[in-house]
């Protein structure tokens, strides 16, 4: 496999995202309140109990599916294995999808009773970049 700059633009941010997901999603999947204390999850006072359930659902699914797919896909992609492209492609599909879902939920919930998200701008600064990187990386590994 040719390790040109685009290879590194898949691998580098991919591993950064992996580390972020362990910290921000895997830990709260075991104890959501720890995620709130760490600042990686929103409290029920900010997003309601339904919002917490929604965010927890993402954390749990990330722990079971997304994080393992991303890690195994990146390792196999690094090794030049064909199945790595398939697994990484699945993880990148999730990478493109979940930020869009989260941003749509943030917009749809703006006027909902009990929804008091203090700093929506953080979502708008980070999530579109993750989506763009995921889409570009998906394109890169399939060409």
Residue ranges and their predicted role:
Residues 1-143:
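Topology signature of small-to-medium multi-pass alpha-helical membrane proteins
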């Amino acid at each position: 496999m040719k390790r040109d700059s685009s290879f590194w633009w898949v691998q580098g941010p991919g591993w950064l995202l992996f580390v972020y997901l362990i910290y921000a999603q895997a830990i709260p999947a075991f104890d959501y309140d720890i995620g709130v204390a760490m600042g990686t999850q929103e409290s029920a006072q900010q997003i309601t109990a339904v919002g917490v359930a929604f965010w927890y659902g993402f954390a749990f699914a990330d722990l079971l599916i997304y994080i393992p797919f991303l890690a195994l896909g990146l390792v196999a992609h690094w090794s030049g294995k064909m199945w790595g492209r398939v697994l990484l492609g699945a993880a990148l599909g999730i990478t493109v999808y979940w930020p869009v879902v989260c941003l749509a939920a943030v917009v749809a919930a703006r006027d909902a009773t009990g929804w008091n998200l203090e700093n929506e701008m953080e979502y708008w600064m980070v999530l579109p970049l993750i989506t763009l990187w995921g889409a570009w990386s998906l394109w890169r590994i399939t060409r």
